[in-house]
Amino acid sequence: MSASGGTKAIVAALSANLAIAVAKFVAFLFSGSSSMLAESVHSLADSGNQGLLLLGGKKAKREATPQHPFGYGRERYIYAFLVSIVLFSVGGMFAVYEGYEKIKHPHEIEAWYWPVGVLIFAIIAEGFSFRTAIKESNQTRGALSWTEFIRRAKAPELPVVLLEDFGALIGLVLALAGVGLAIGTGDGVWDGIGTLCIGILLIAIAIVLAAETKSLLLGEAAGTDQVEKIKAAVVDGDTVTGIIHMRTLHLGPEELLVAAKIAVQHDDTATEVANAINAAESRIREAVPIARVIYLEPDIYNEAAARSGTNPAKNAAKDAKGPAEEAPDAKGPSDPTETSH
């Protein structure tokens, strides 16, 4: 997922949310609607969240240092996680509290045309922002469903903006329904119920965001397609005959670490093995350009021994030397290759 695409969606969402937040707050001042107050805080929180995403993207571009040798790519994950915290606390909990207070102490909505007009304007503005996020996401989504895209995306910006914009549109519909029922019935309780529903919605979205960004912070492997490309690139059929085991890890959305133990011929010289490793690294980077950090460890692998036990190197040494001697332990191919969830 390109960083530029994510930035475009973030800027579009930030511009829309700032304008909407001001309009909603003005509508609250004239009407006294708690739904409008909750929605204005919601839009303000969303604006702050987009600012956090932009800040995280900027910090992630810093060069690696001796203290952080793998760079700062995970800054984008950290700031995306902060977004979920802000959405939960500032947006969700405030709306729940405001809704509860309005249900407990209801009052009629004054100057009803202000909240109705602003909500219609906000739905249109959020619709344009949501459309931009969908358009940018479709460039990288491929054949994935939207649920799979959000779960598997390694760059957090677009999934965050998608969920925020989707939540904003649903929240606006809930606010419009609450205000409409309050105006139609003359009972301000409906305004409070709409506000309460908005808070519950924001909390639910915040929990989903927190779960997904937590997985990225813990460290996710490359996607299945990328793993298969790496496997195909490593083996040349001459010096490198196979992969004993391999691990991949995203150091950031666009930085991948690859570590593998590879099988080489037992009679190859050190120079031949070194040249084969360098060639394999070049093939990996060509197949998967985001593979920035690559560690390949050569080892001797015996296929016949692999079929006879779980430790092929050790079993092969036993067959050659007899029961009196044992070769040093070496890992076999029993470790599965990791893929993303």
Sequence positions of predicted segments:
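Residues that define the loop-to-transmembrane-helix transition and helix capping
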Residues: 7, 33-36, 188-192
